[in-house]
Amino acid sequence: MNVYKQVLFQNINKLLSLYNIDNFSNTYGYADREFWGWKIKDFSNATLQGGVHSLSIALKLNVFEGYQKEHILEVINSAILAVEKISAKNGSVVEAYPGENSFCVTALVAFDVLSAIKYLDNDLTVNQKDKYFDIIRPLVGFITKHGEEHAIISNHLATGVAAIALWNYLANDINSRDKELLQIIYDNKSDEGWYLEYEGADPGYQTLCTY
């Protein structure tokens, strides 16, 4: 088995255990157990909803054992629908604190859900795709209208580029914000070859940025 596929196989149950699969719960589909399960937080970290990306890849690679395909598809569906419930009115989502309006996490969740749509194309109905696009459209709108306010953080900006480029591809849109964000990355790139992360180079972040 491919080493990356093996890692996915070894961790898929851990990923599945994040999600609230009680369809009678108000937090059905939420992925932050500290919020929906242990109740030690008063907000849900939206980053974890992005696990649908990995679940869709795992489904495509057929690495699930002991699970019906329909069950995995419903976990993914509930997690994507939950994004709508945890999104703010301005289209943003949070990671670290209420009202965060996180550019990076909003872009990341948009990219991950859109990636799931891409990988599951043949398993989704037209109505499902339209519903998912309706959920992600406000997130794309947020990262179109707002920037990364903390600093020049190239990996955050690159996440926005990836999200909008994939949105344009799947939703047949012509949003040019991806090119604007990419230009900011290039304008702040070092002559030594590294991309700016806050005040300098960061090999770890550069790995994520170039991915």
For each of these PLM feature ranges, what is it?
Residues 40-211:
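Aromatic-lined, polymer-binding surfaces characteristic
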